[in-house]
Amino acid sequence: VAAAHRPQLDSLRRVVLGYDGTYLPTVLPGRSLPSEKDAVFKVGHVLFENISDNEAKTLMRTCGIAENTQVSLQQIEEAMRLLRDKYLYMDVTYSVTQDQNHYDLTLRAFHKSKSKVGLGARFDTEDMASVIMGADLVLNTRVPSRLGVVGKLGEQYYVRANFSLEPHLYRTLGFSYEFRNSDMNINHRGRRVYNLSYHRHTVGVSFTHLRLRNFSGEIGIKGTGYDYGDVLSGVYEVDHLKNKFFYSAYTNLRYNSQDKGYYPMRGSKLYVECSYVSDKIADWSRPHAFGVMSASWETISRLSRRFALQPGVRGRVLWGRDIPLPFANAYGGSMAGKYVDQQLPFVGVSRLEPSKAALMVADVKLRYNLLKNHYVTGIFNVAAENDKLSNLPRGRYFYGFGFKYGFDTRFGPIEAMFSYSNNSEKLLFYLGVGFDF
């Protein structure tokens, strides 16, 4: 939950359910659609085909669609999203026909599925090869419920199970368990300083509210246990690293209006999370407890038919003394949360590097759409770190830049990038094939 990122979700959706954030509604041919400038139009009759009466009533009530009222294309897209995400219809279409001074709207759905299983693979120069397997089951219970299981095989492997109850639409009570194995090299200024290996067990309970379009909010509690194997090896010594269990309470808010998980052309993303962590369930005062706040934002602006500008900023701040190593800030790599949940990506740094208690990264990407699915991107990012948020302007600064080529395929992007930073002072090469997970 702490590192829920859109590309990862899109990967699992495509692997398990067969679609992702690039899905666009299918409009039947031979129909008269309102033009883009008439995005809000009057609907006379609303018809449903192969959709149950209860589902139709829920769609109309939730999306605000009614006969003889003004309806927007966004409302129709929201209804179709519900048919796919909530009711698991694999083939959803809509059509509108003009009748005098109004339109008749028809929603069609086919091939409703009770469960889905999937398999995916990925290769990159950071994690080598990895395979993901997943299943999503809709259970036949009085209260709508689901069971999801996802497993990853690779150098960093995990298995995750989620059980959710949805007594009301958009309001979900979830229970989760995850086992994760981590074996990673930790760098400092581009050089390996030690190796860290451990098993992590996480159990959690959460409540999610998804009522507003593009927004979701979540509150929850979770417990996380760390079991260290080969604790540390290398030139650095870290004291007081013991097997331990931590308790945390958190809340987060997400907003995502981007049209695609990879190579979006419009929209923004925002993520904010606050949490409080303690190593004793009966004592939430310092020095046993500490606070965490993390946030990220990015948007995209089309400069022309082929050029797009994508600025972003992300950061994480810790409040407390003697922060345990598993919760310390970290940066590096091409993907957020790849090795640890709190990892912030940074172009020009290939491996995970620990950071001080206050860390902020800003980046800007200039992307050129070379051909239909071919993209060339120039990236520049800069970071600042210090022991306290108030001292961040006087902290250590470092920068990095890179040039990336990407080819977007139905099986995931193929990307190659050269990068450099004054943190590592090395020319780096990265190659990735497949969706991030």
Language-model features: locations:
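C-terminal outer-membrane beta-barrel translocator/porin domains of Gram-negative envelope proteins
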Residues: Y250-R254, Q258-L371, G378
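C-terminal structured domain segments
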Residues: Y397-D408
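C-terminal hydrophobic structural anchor segments
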Residues: K365-Y399
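Hydrophobic, well-ordered secondary-structure elements that form the walls
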Residues: L83, V364, Y405, A416
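Gram-negative/organellar outer-membrane beta-barrel architecture
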Residues: L73-Q74, D85, D91-T93, Q98-Y262, ...
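Short, glycine/charged-rich beta-strand-loop motifs at protein surfaces that mediate ligand recognition
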Residues: V193, S350-E353, D387-P393
